[in-house]
């Protein structure tokens, strides 16, 4: 039962949800409904005013940061990194929960980095600076970093926003591959309802800071829902 607000204005109102292991779970809803705020609370970026987020029965707020990072990766919508950092260096950051900052990469770490770049199809970009990549290439590199982290759960905040349609589909196909090939649990925020319908096992539809409905896409993407939630 998570609640969150700013300056007395409620943003999330008594939110309760559960995520089944091995599923792709997508949060949808109109702008300002609290989707990204909810994802930030799940990932511990924001602290709820009441309620708690549990991972296998343990409150994530009390978890050791490195231990939590070994289990859960987050890809925010806005990312800051030195533009001259190479793709390979960025993906190597995903190993820091295992090695510690400044820790030397072992052969296993290097193999994980190579595997992640291969899965994302960016091996040929390994020596390119992040600042020289297209938006789609950059997003694939960031997702590869999350994969190198070897978590059980990946949280993605609007991973297809501002990308050309071809890269949107590549990103979502990669997300599906991570779910199926690595049994990773995916929780993501999406704006595009068609993409949510195609790539999700379970959808949480939000309206005005609350969960409006949840279920398989075919069960909740109904005309009356679109009218009530999206006013279309």
Language-model segments: residues:
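The feature captures the beta-strand-to-loop junction immediately N-terminal to the Walker
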Residues: 28-30
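Helix-to-loop junction immediately C-terminal to a conserved catalytic motif
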Residues: 43
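Conserved ABC transporter NBD signature motif
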Residues: 51-59, 68
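Conserved ABC ATPase "signature" region
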Residues: 92, 107-125
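Conserved ABC ATPase signature
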Residues: 104, 129-133, 137
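Catalytic Walker B motif of ABC-type/P-loop ATPase nucleotide-binding domains
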Residues: 154-158
């Amino acid at each position: 039962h998570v609640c969150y607000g700013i300056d007395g204005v409620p943003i999330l109102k008594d939110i309760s949800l559960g995520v089944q292991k091995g599923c792709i779970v997508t949060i949808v809803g109109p702008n300002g409904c609290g989707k990204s705020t909810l994802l930030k609370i799940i990932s511990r970026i924001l602290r709820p005013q009441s309620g708690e987020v549990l991972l296998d029965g343990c409150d994530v707020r009390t978890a050791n940061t490195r231990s939590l990072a070994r289990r859960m990766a987050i890809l925010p919508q806005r990312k800051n990194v030195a533009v001259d950092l190479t793709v390979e260096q960025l993906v190597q950051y995903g190993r820091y929960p295992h090695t510690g900052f400044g820790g030397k990469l072992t052969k296993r770490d290097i193999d994980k980095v190579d595997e992640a770049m291969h899965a994302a199809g960016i091996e040929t970009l390994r020596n390119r600076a992040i600042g020289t990549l297209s938006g789609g290439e950059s997003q694939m590199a960031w997702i590869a970093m999350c994969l190198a982290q070897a978590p059980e759960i990946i949280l993605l905040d609007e991973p297809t926003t501002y990308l050309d349609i071809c890269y949107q589909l590549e990103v979502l196909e990669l997300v599906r591959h991570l779910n199926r090939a690595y049994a990773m649990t995916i929780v993501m925020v999406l704006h595009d309802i068609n993409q949510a319908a195609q790539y999700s096992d379970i959808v949480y539809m939000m309206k005005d800071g609350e969960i409006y409905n949840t279920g398989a896409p075919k069960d909740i993407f109904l005309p009356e829902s679109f009218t009530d939630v999206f006013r279309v």
